[in-house]
């Protein structure tokens, strides 16, 4: 405190003790000469007139706790005594700041709150020597600071108000690292796009449930292959059955054709008929060419017609029992030109 400020203080305000209240609510009584060494306390006494009694104690800032206040007053007691040499003060200061980093930081903060600049400078120089030559990671480890800065924030350019060449070089290095960081981020984004998860919902559910999607796919493919084989076997079986039916029909047709051929030959041998036609069972008044053979005796012709009809009737009844309803009755006809034809049901159009 300067001599001018000391002269302003009235005699009645000069007390032997000043009452101070810390942030935790505790009240301390400190010598006036020691307390007035702190500019903040001196201003409170002069401007507000507080600190003269316990009921009007001076409220100290939040960062000043009782332990730090005791250290600050020890420093003030030593330095407020006149007549000490600079060497003595320097030795005392070196011993005074021998403490751990945490307490040194708290002391710096408390001295700054009380506006005690000599002590702030002393503790700040001590902190500067501690962090000198350390990397940001080491500094955070020393002061137990969390690494809450992103890579881009760490590489932001520094302000170079004094045009320091070292800061210029450092900013160039930061710019290069920022460029490399952006390139790495681009590569990562490309890799993420390439490795897009294309699994189906079933595979994802299987993965969540702890099953192997490959096993599920294998079982599904086996089921599909089994179904395909069953369908192929069913279609082949159906094809074979259809072929067997067709072959059976062809056999029955060929047998029927042989029967008809044999019947026709037998009929020709037994009756010695000169000819046969398919339209024998058409009405007697209708003939294919409208021709009537006048050389055949009508009585003999009538007898032959009856024999042919009777034979055809018996032949038809035997065919129904042998091949069912697949064939129509075989009709024989004899026309006047001495030729004969046979009809075999649906194949009547073939001669």
Curated annotation (Swiss-Prot):
State the UniProt keywords alphabetically. Answer: Nucleus, Ubl conjugation pathway
What are its GO biological-process terms?
auxin-activated signaling pathway; jasmonic acid mediated signaling pathway; protein ubiquitination; response to auxin; response to jasmonic acid; ubiquitin-dependent protein catabolic process
User: According to its UniProt record, what is one Pfam family this protein matches?
Assistant: Skp1
* Region (Disordered) residue spans: 216-240, 330-351
Keyword flag Nucleus: yes
| InterPro entries hit by this protein | SKP1 (IPR016897), SKP1-like (IPR001232), SKP1-like_dim_sf (IPR036296), SKP1/BTB/POZ_sf (IPR011333), Skp1_comp_dimer (IPR016072)
Q: In which pathway does it act?
A: Protein modification; protein ubiquitination
Q: Which GO terms describe its cellular component?
A: nucleus; SCF ubiquitin ligase complex
- Where in this protein does the record put region Interaction with the F-box domain of F-box proteins? 108-167
Biased composition (Polar residues) is annotated at 330-342
Instruction: From the Swiss-Prot or TrEMBL record, state where the protein is found.
Output: Nucleus
According to the UniProt entry, which residue ranges have a biased composition of type Basic residues?
A: 217-230
Assembly behavior? Part of a SCF (SKP1-cullin-F-box) protein ligase complex.
Q: What family is reported?
A: Belongs to the SKP1 family.
**Record function comment:** Involved in ubiquitination and subsequent proteasomal degradation of target proteins. Together with CUL1, RBX1 and a F-box protein, it forms a SCF E3 ubiquitin ligase complex. The functional specificity of this complex depends on the type of F-box protein. In the SCF complex, it serves as an adapter that links the F-box protein to CUL1.
Protein name per UniProt: SKP1-like protein 21
Protein species of origin: Arabidopsis thaliana
Lineage runs: Eukaryota, Viridiplantae, Streptophyta, Embryophyta, Tracheophyta
């Amino acid at each position: 405190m300067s001599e001018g400020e000391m002269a302003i203080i009235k005699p009645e305000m000069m007390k032997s003790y000043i009452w101070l209240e810390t942030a935790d609510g505790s009240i301390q009584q400190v010598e006036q000469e020691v307390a007035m060494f702190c500019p903040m306390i001196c201003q409170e006494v002069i401007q507000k007139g507080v600190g003269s009694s316990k009921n009007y104690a001076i409220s100290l800032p939040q960062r000043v706790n009782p332990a730090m206040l005791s250290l600050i007053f020890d420093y003030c007691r030593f330095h407020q005594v006149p007549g000490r040499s600079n060497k003595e003060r320097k030795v005392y200061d070196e011993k005074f700041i021998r403490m751990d980093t945490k307490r040194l930081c708290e002391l710096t903060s408390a001295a700054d709150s009380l506006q005690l600049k000599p002590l702030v400078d002393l503790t700040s120089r001590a902190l500067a020597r501690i962090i000198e030559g350390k990397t940001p990671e080491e500094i955070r480890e020393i002061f137990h600071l969390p690494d809450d800065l992103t890579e881009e924030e760490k590489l932001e350019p520094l302000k170079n108000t004094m045009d320091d060449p070292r800061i210029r070089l450092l900013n160039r290095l930061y710019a290069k690292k920022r460029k490399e960081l952006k390139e790495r981020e681009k590569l990562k984004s490309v890799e993420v796009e390439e490795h897009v998860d294309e699994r189906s919902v079933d595979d994802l559910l299987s993965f969540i449930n702890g099953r192997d999607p490959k096993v599920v796919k294998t079982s599904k493919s086996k089921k599909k292959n089994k179904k395909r084989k069953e369908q192929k076997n069913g279609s082949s079986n159906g094809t074979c059955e259809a072929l067997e039916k067709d072959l059976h029909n062809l056999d029955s047709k060929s047998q029927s054709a042989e029967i008809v051929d044999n019947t026709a030959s037998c009929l020709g041998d037994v009756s010695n008929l000169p000819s046969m036609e398919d339209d024998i069972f058409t009405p007697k008044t209708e003939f294919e060419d409208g021709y009537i053979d006048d050389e055949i005796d009508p009585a003999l012709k009538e007898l032959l017609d009856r024999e042919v009809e009777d034979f055809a009737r018996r032949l038809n009844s035997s065919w129904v029992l042998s091949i069912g309803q697949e064939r129509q009755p075989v009709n024989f006809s004899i026309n006047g030109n001495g030729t004969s034809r046979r009809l075999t049901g649906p194949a009547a159009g073939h001669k």
